Amino acid sequence: PVVVSGQVQADRYSQDGKLQLLVDFIDLIAAGKDVSQLLATTTKDIQEYKKKFINLVAQVKKPPLRELLGEIFSGERWEKFIRNPAAKRFHHAYIGGLLEHTVDVAETALAIVGAMPNIDRDMVIAGALLHDIGKTEEISAAIGFSYTDSGHLMGHITAGVLLVEDAARQVQYFSEADRKSLIHIILSHHGDREKGSPVCCATREAV
């Protein structure tokens, strides 16, 4: 990474109002120096989004499913989840982006299924909260938001499935039906195979 100082101003020779960047100084940043303030960061209130997330988890009525969420969103992974970007460049590509995107998806999903009969509301919440959990393993929150080894070798969908599989083994009485339903949501959340999902949506909760 480098530090740059300069200014942006209108190009007086441009006919269409283009801007030009005038660089006064550029230098390498010393190794180990804190550069977190240089990273793009969400404009939303992180603390408010954390409260929204916790409230969503609290709405899950099935104890094993709620316990699974607690198992996954804890410790170091929780810290990575609230800090990580949701993508390298396509959407929510900034610090706090993954938390923001996840909460927004969950709230939208709940608004859609509010009046729908014969749907597992708990599974909708859990699936929405976990659909991109693999991005805590796929993308680094350091400068450049580069892909990790897991990101290059597996991608976030596979990483997410592995995280859920591992957590489900730690939760007593976690049903096989819920395990399959939750994993299906993660596998199918891109919608189509052409968009990266190994399978297409086959349950109401996944849709």
Region spans (language model):
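Divalent metal-dependent catalytic cores for phosphoryl transfer on phosphate-bearing substrates
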Residues: 90, 100, 111-207
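OB-fold and OB-like beta-barrel modules that bind single-stranded nucleic acids
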Residues: 1-12
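Residue-level signal for short amphipathic helical patches enriched in basic/charged
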Residues: 60, 93, 119
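A short mid-domain helix/strand-loop element embedded in enzyme catalytic domains
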Residues: 65-108, 130-134
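A general alpha-helix detector
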Residues: 52-53, 108, 163
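A ubiquitous short alpha-helical element
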Residues: 35-41, 92-94, 148-152
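Short, well-ordered alpha-helical segments in soluble proteins
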Residues: 57-64, 76-77, 102, 106-116, ...
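Extended, charge-rich, solvent-exposed interface segments
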Residues: 13-85, 159
